[in-house]
Amino acid sequence: MYSLGIDIGGTKCAVILGKGELCENTDGFIIDKIKFPTDVKRGWKAVLNEILEKGDELLSRNNIKSTELIGVGISCGGPLNSKKGTINCPPNLPDWDNVPIVKIVREHFGVRCVLHNDANACAVAEWRFGAGKGYNNLVFLTFGTGMGAGLILDGRLYCGTNDCAGEVGHIRLAENGPVGYGKAGSFEGFCSGGGIKNLAQMTAKKYLEENKVSLLFKTQEDIEKLDAKIVAEAMYQGDTFAKEVYTKCAEYLGRGLSVIIDILNPEAVVIGSIYERNQEFFLPIIKDVIKKEALSFNAEVCEILPAKLGDSIGDFAALGVLF
């Protein structure tokens, strides 16, 4: 038996063929994959038709019938309704309003279909296949373009009353600060790709006003070119400004983690993307903050781990929601 996964994003989509049962080793679990750009201008029907066509192509070229599938898993940015099986106009998919994707996909392939938002699906992926294997209480933080969480509580994915559990990005950690989730000083404002960019630009303006020096900028035009990747590279080259930006980001990551640790009491928090690439810098700082901010008996039982699946997480996420 086999599994089929659909990963829908604002810039690209992927259809993934996997094995039909969990295995200890992830090597070989994914059998084949087709990815293609998401042409949102064509509208949701055209994009979804292309997804279904690519799914058929994937099965055909691997000599697999749809009757051999255990199901189809779908991962997509929210808002969505996993119980009703609808996608409800995510920001990067503007005309996907109340699209009954589960019904359409189920009828096309004739098998069960499961839909979850991407943060939840990634949490399941790291829990089933990655750094979270073996834990019953786990929080996954995206820490990429945005900041969201997926929650595995008592050995099950927890979605909340209306699929909005884990929306940690909007939590305000400071009265002022970079804007994320439309809110100044939010978790996402300090701890996301866009947030680090905003934090860097705010800090750089102060540097110019105070006549401080950085390798990265001399003018306002230079400041506007700053982003999370550029600043990270400069940090590893010893730039004081870049280190200040990432230190502040790490401190607020520690504050956000302290809130999560005390509210949910998890065994582990798995953090993806930016943390995954910069763990050695972040970890000592966030440990110091957690030691000060979180209850000691909660902090002591919680591990902070980098995500393990890397760029493949979207593939495992789409397939993982089936298991």
Sequence positions of predicted segments:
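Catalytic-core segment of enzymes that process non-peptidic bonds
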Residues: 152-153, 157-158
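General beta-strand structural signal in soluble alpha/beta enzymes
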Residues: 113-117
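Short beta-strand segments
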Residues: 7, 73-77, 140-146, 150-152
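A charged helix-plus-loop insertion that forms the helical arch/lid used to bind
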Residues: 85-96
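Adenylate-forming
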Residues: 122-128, 151, 170-172
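ATP-binding/phosphotransfer module of carbohydrate and carboxylate kinases, centering on a glycine-rich
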Residues: 1-71, 81-84, 103-111, 125-135, ...
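Structural signature of FAD isoalloxazine-binding scaffolds in flavoprotein oxidoreductases
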Residues: 164-168
